[in-house]
């Protein structure tokens, strides 16, 4: 976790306190980004490992969605895929964490989700975010909005996720796996 941001916020709070004002330090959410071989990896909030270490259980206490949107509209040249995982509380949809990786736009999306976590917002709130839009930068439905829609679908029972570790058992029990993606999305 990069400490420059938290250190500067603490310094400001200390200075405010010495000047007669002051607020309590709210701690850190844990937001970071780094460049790895031409890609940006970023995260904010809690990841699954931290939640499980705290005794929380997938499905019961938290769920997640993983989406693969483009960082801007696909008709504009250069649209790059982002892999975005959003973790949320099962009981009320409060956002707990997110991780993303991609060539472009990853830091922007993680920063927006970090702000949502800092305000204890829900996946439904993400759907309503009005984010800047222009074809070179985003889509009318930004990846942040799309993550909110996907998570809300899970909470409302409109979408039932199947984890990779569950797939083999489902296929063995007779389930059929059908890939409905168009050829240009299959890679």
Locations of the language-model features?
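Mid-to-C-terminal Rossmann-like scaffold of FAD/NAD(P)H-dependent oxidoreductases
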Residues: 1-104, 139, 143-169, 175
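A short, polar/charged loop-to-alpha-helix boundary motif
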Residues: 104-123
């Amino acid at each position: 976790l990069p400490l420059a941001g938290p250190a500067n916020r603490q310094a400001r709070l200390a200075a405010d306190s010495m000047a007669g004002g002051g607020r309590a330090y709210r701690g850190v959410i844990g937001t970071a980004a780094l460049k790895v071989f031409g890609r940006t990896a970023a995260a904010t909030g809690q990841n699954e490992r931290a939640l499980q270490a705290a005794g929380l259980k997938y499905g019961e206490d938290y769920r997640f969605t993983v989406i693969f949107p483009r960082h801007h509209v696909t008709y504009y040249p250069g649209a790059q895929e982002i892999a975005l995982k959003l973790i949320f509380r099962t009981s009320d949809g409060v956002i707990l964490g997110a991780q993303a990786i991609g060539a472009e736009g990853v830091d922007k999306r993680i920063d927006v989700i970090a702000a949502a976590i800092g305000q204890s917002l829900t996946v439904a709130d993400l759907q309503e975010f009005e984010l800047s839009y222009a074809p070179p930068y985003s889509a009318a439905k930004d990846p942040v909005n799309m993550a909110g829609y996907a998570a809300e679908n899970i909470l409302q029972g409109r979408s039932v996720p199947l984890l990779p570790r569950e797939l083999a058992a489902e296929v063995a029990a007779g389930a059929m796996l059908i890939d409905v993606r168009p050829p240009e999305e299959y890679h």
